[in-house]
Regions:
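Non-catalytic cap/lid and distal C-terminal segments of serine-dependent acyl enzymes
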Residues: 1-278
């Protein structure tokens, strides 16, 4: 299993950026050959939450081991605290970066499948919002979307003020990220608005997986979002389970995301120090 830290210049962000990439290219199979080596990899673009970066998923979960077991490439970029939105005036176009540039450049760098049905996007909290919104916005690219404890907070944002001790709940911060909070319901900032317009235009929806912990304060808005997606006809798999807004929950449920994705059921785990028997 190759784990790479990759630096490159992003035209969408107009600066160098760093990402982690998991690529199961070096599996060891004693005494046999496998055709897995010649197939382009199905790919998961995996987004972190507020105050995180490209290292979060590798340090907080077992994604590296599970990606090897599933023969899955995983790309983990940094999104700052910008909710994976475009900010054209500041050359901080994170939506374009995630939905277009990152996919294009990783497909040039690595043996990744170019098929929509093999290209997935997921994230937690802020990254869950970013995965859902950009997965719908770039529906020609992503066939599957997954959000864990997703920050579906647009309704709450409309009544925000600056009294919260949490910087990401302050009105001033939210206005800097999302702009005029009075207009967010009826524009592409709102994933529900994107989905409604896709339905009007007869555009097929990506498959969607949503999960949230029973002790997570984001549970009510995630339930509401699930209901809206189901009413629109989105193929939604929804789960709740013990846990709060924490890595213990995300570690368990990112495994469930991988089990839900259309990955190779007959993929074999290579020999490694954890299973070699010595």
């Amino acid at each position: 299993m190759a784990l790479m830290e990759v630096n490159f210049f992003s035209k969408a962000l107009m600066r160098p950026v760093t990402m982690n990439v998991i690529l199961p290219v070096d599996k060891v199979f004693f005494g046999e050959e496998t055709e897995e080596e010649n197939k382009p990899f199905k790919t998961l673009y995996l987004l972190h939450g507020v105050m995180g970066n490209y290292t979060d998923w590798v340090t907080g979960t077992c994604i590296k081991r599970w990606a090897e077991e599933k023969n899955l490439a995983v790309v983990m970029p940094s999104g700052a605290n910008m909710f994976y939105m475009d900010h054209t005036n500041a050359n901080e176009n994170y939506s374009e970066f995630i939905g277009k540039e990152l996919v294009k450049i990783t497909r040039r760098m690595f043996p990744l499948s170019h098929k929509k049905e093999d290209t997935f996007i997921a994230g937690l909290s802020m990254g869950g919002y970013g995965a859902i919104r950009n997965g719908l916005k770039y529906h020609d690219t992503f066939g599957y979307i997954a959000g864990l404890s997703s920050a579906m907070i647009l309704e709450k944002m409309r009544t925000a003020d600056d009294s919260s001790p949490m910087f990401f709940e302050k009105k001033s911060f939210l206005e800097n990220v999302f702009g005029d909070l009075s207009r967010i319901k009826d524009c592409e900032i709102n994933p529900e608005w994107i989905a409604e317009n896709m339905k009007k235009d007869g555009i097929p929806f990506p498959h969607m997986y949503l999960a949230c912990g029973l002790d997570d304060p984001l549970l009510p808005p995630n339930r509401k979002f699930r209901d809206t997606m189901q009413k629109l006809g989105v193929d939604v798999t929804y789960e709740e389970g013990p846990g709060a807004h924490e890595w213990d929950f995300w570690n368990r449920y990112i495994k469930r995301v991988l089990d839900w994705l259309p990955l190779d059921k007959d993929s074999k785990e290579g020999m490694n120090s954890g299973n070699v028997g010595l």
